[in-house]
């Protein structure tokens, strides 16, 4: 009981985080589905080997390390969805795209997006 009392803020933080993640996931799936219907470009930032082991049909493989010199391949008017194995590299790619004036969204795990399509 003493541990719970002394760490009450950690418990509250975990609960709030779980609520946020649950709500974010629901919202993002709807948004991603809409973006795909609108013709968004899906950019898979996993390595070539990861991509070759399974990927979303019509997605473009640009490993995260190559993005800085391949970004010119994309049109700034296109909506972009970044994906990877867990969502972490996709977030980095999204931030990079957006910092260069593109309209990018982190799609998270490629396998989750594949299930929505």
Specify the residue positions occupied by each region the protein language model found:
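Short hydrophobic beta-strand that contains or immediately precedes a catalytic carboxylate
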Residues: 41-45
